[in-house]
Structures are given as structure tokens and as C-alpha cells.
Amino acid sequence: MKTIRQWVGGEYYEGSPLGVIPVENSATGEVTAELLQASKEDLDHTVEVARDAQKEWANYSLSKRVAIMFKMRQLVLDHQDEMARLIVEEHGKNYSDAIGEIQRGRETLDFATAINVALKGEYSHDVSTGVDIHTTRQPVGVVAGICPFNFPAMVPMWMHPLAVATGNAFILKPASPTPSASLLTAELYKEAGLPDGVFNVLSGDRRSVQDILVHSGIDAISFVGSTPVAHIVQDTGVSHGKRVHALGGANNHAIVMPDSDLDFAAQHISASAFGAAGERCMALPVVVAVGGCGPQVAEKVKKYAEAIKVGEGMGEGVEMGPVISAKAKDRIVGLIDDAEKRGSKVVLDGRGLTVPGYENGHFLGPTVLDDVPLDAPVYTEEVFGPVLAIVHADTYEEALKIVNAQPFGNGSAIFTNDGGVARRFTLDVEAGMVGVNVPIPTPVAFYSFGGWKESLLGDTHIHGPEGVTFYTRAKAITERWPTEKTYAATMSFQREE
């Protein structure tokens, strides 16, 4: 059986592992590899290597860094088929979705190739006689990125291109079920010419995360995952003197107004709710149907959803793969069962789906629930599966209250042909990313990504301009170069008369 090791200092590294973690093929249920679990000693060694490498890397000119990022961008493009196949094998998502996440992740590499522009400082001439001020941004040092299983390529690429391009060293802690895309990324960075030790991959379980959070040699932490863990990351990291941004969970809502094109809305809702088997923080698990249009929306979504081909990710025409594990499947089925007991109408039931030849895989079909009570766990919790819950509201105002009452604020959308209502929604909804007739309002990489409320802990969003801010520290430099005319020193603030 294949053994998956760490990547430290530009090479594969075995170290002194605590044990192994099984890596499973979600479509077959079979264990395909054993992942070495890093020890505290492995982390200490990795941090030491990263700190030494960062000192050299920070002194590379911006032009040299940009050249390496350009090479890396091209290498990711050249190897996207290989990377996508690794993702399909471990995560289970269909091949086209795996290619799609790599392409979206590569957008951050695109942005990183212009880091010489993003790092331009500010300058003021003669703020006082003969005194100039300018600002510069310098790397924070060693950054750790802690990533979830659902996007093994894209979410790490939200982090490491900007962290590396701004002069930091990076330690990537991938999710244990999906480590291989991160290791291929490490190989590509080496081929691109990145100095050894600047990019490292260290795998493990929650003990590895805890070790990262308290390690004195790590200066900043980027995290994407569930909200309960995000709170731990934020609280522990900050209390140990680290810069932290922690992106938590989501329960994204879309309001469907009765004036909207319901066929258009249903088609996009289906793709957004069931793409990637619903295992994404920008999935659309909840629709708030206004003015009695709920049953129509449910039936129209059903028409599109029941046509989705579910199967093994490399299968021809497959549009949706399995969920990540048997445990995840059981939890999702339990939420559907509970919703049915509470009176929800099961418009489309995916609980009994099996895929011929993959009976041990963790498959569920798309499920559409209508008239879901607001106290049902399938509504209140982050489902992270192929389930759409439709709730009802009489008016736009009632629908907005429902959307804003939830603790999450990642992404929200509205379907309407009324520009006035749409504008009100964009201003009034409590979410960090908002779509008008766009169900997954994920911004491109030169904007920043992140939510509000329980969906984001910390002060900065990820990638884009806020990403550059997070991975750097500002320094204001005040200069005076005396000439023949000298200035007397005083004990007070210098000022012009």
C-alpha cells in the first residue's frame, strides 16, 4: 500500500511519525494509502527549515519572485489533469469539478504574478520641510495554512500564492482525507525554482493543528473549515501572539421572488445546491421562496436535479460524486429523516441511491425538501451534502428577516427582475458575498473572499488585496537628509510656523 509522506525542505520527508491515517477512495470505500502523521518533532524541524529559508527568500527581488510565480502558474496548468485525478481518487468529486477547482485556484496565482504592483507603497514628499515619508510592506515570516478536505487544490491556492509571493515561508497542513494535491503542488514549486524550505507540507490530525497553533516559530495562520474549529484556531492562535484569519462554516440562503424567471432560478439553484455533492462553503442549501412560489420552485428544481448523473468521478458524463465518508453520509441521511418527521415534504429523495459497481461508495442523490420548518436541523445546521431545504415567506421583508436571523453570513443571493428589490437586498443582507441572480457569488481572485458573522473570525478576508495585507506588515519610514542649512533639534513635535 502506498505511503504518503511529508514535504520539508524541498524533498519528501518521513521524520518520526506518530502513526498513520488511512486515506480512502470515497467512491469505492477502499483504503488506498496510508498517510504519515507528523509529530511535534517533525513540526519543530519543519519550522526551523522554513525560518531559515524565509530569510533568504525575503531578500529575493520582486522581479525574481514574480518570475517564479509565472512559472508556477504555467506548471499548475500543465499538470492540472494529474492533479484532478488525484482529487477524484481521494475526494470523490467528478473530474470536471476537480478541473474547475484547479482553474479557480489558479486565479490566485494569476494575482500573485502581479505582486510587484500589489506591494507598491505610499509616498509623501515634504510632509515637513525636507522631510519625506514612504511606506513599505514586509513579510510576516512563517505562515501556516490549515485547509479542509472539500477543495484540496483551490483552498490552499487561496493562501500559498500570496503568502509566498509576499516573501513568507509557508507550511501547508492539508486535510487528512485529501493530501496528495498538496504534495504535487510542492513538487511543482520546486520545479518552478522556489528555494527549498519556502513551501512545506505537513500532515496530521487535530494534534498537529494544536501544535501549529501554539508554536512560537509560526507567525500567522490561515484557516478554512468549520465554525467550531475556527473559534479554536482564532482564540488559541491569537492568544499565542499570531496573526489569524479563520474562515468558518456557512448556510447560504437565496431568496426567490415571485417575479423572477423561475426556470432560470431553478436551473441555477440545482447546480449550486448539488454541485460537488453540496460539499462546499458556497453551496446553496436553502431557498426562501416568497409569495407562494415555493411549490413551483421545488418542482422545477426537481426536474433539473433528477437529471444529474451521480457516479464515480472519472465516469463518462458524471456530474456528481459521493460525499467524503460513511460518517458524513449517515449524518446527512439523519438530517433528511428528521426533516421528514417534522413535516417537510420530500419532493426528491436521494437517500436510496446506489451506483452499480460502487455499492460500498458513499453516494447520495440530490434531495429536495419543501416547506421545511425553521427549527429543523436540516435548516439550522450546515448540511454539507446534496440537500436543498425550501422555506416559505409571504413577503420580501419576511424573507430578509429569515436570512439575517441565521448565525452565518458567508454568501447570500436573490433571484428577481425588480432592480429596486435587488438593490435593497444587496444593502440590507448580512453577508460578506452577495449575488443578484448569481447563486454562488464567489468573487474573482483580485477581490477578497470571506463572509460575516460566524463565517469569518479575524479582521481580514482571504486572497485579493486583503490577502496581501494579511501576509505582510506595514512599515512607515520618515527620512530627512540635511544640507548646508541645518535644523535645530527640539523636544517638541516638529512643525511648520
Where on the chain are the PLM-derived regions?
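Structural signal for hydrophobic packing residues in well-ordered secondary-structure cores
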Residues: 54, 58, 73-80, 84, ...
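Residue-level signal for inorganic ion chemistry
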Residues: 29, 65, 87, 109, ...
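ALDH superfamily catalytic-core signature
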Residues: 220, 228-373, 436, 485-487, ...
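Residues at or immediately preceding the N-termini of alpha-helices
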Residues: 26, 40-43, 62, 95, ...
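Short, well-ordered beta-strand elements within core beta-sheets of diverse protein domains
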Residues: 32-38, 52-59, 145, 254-257, ...
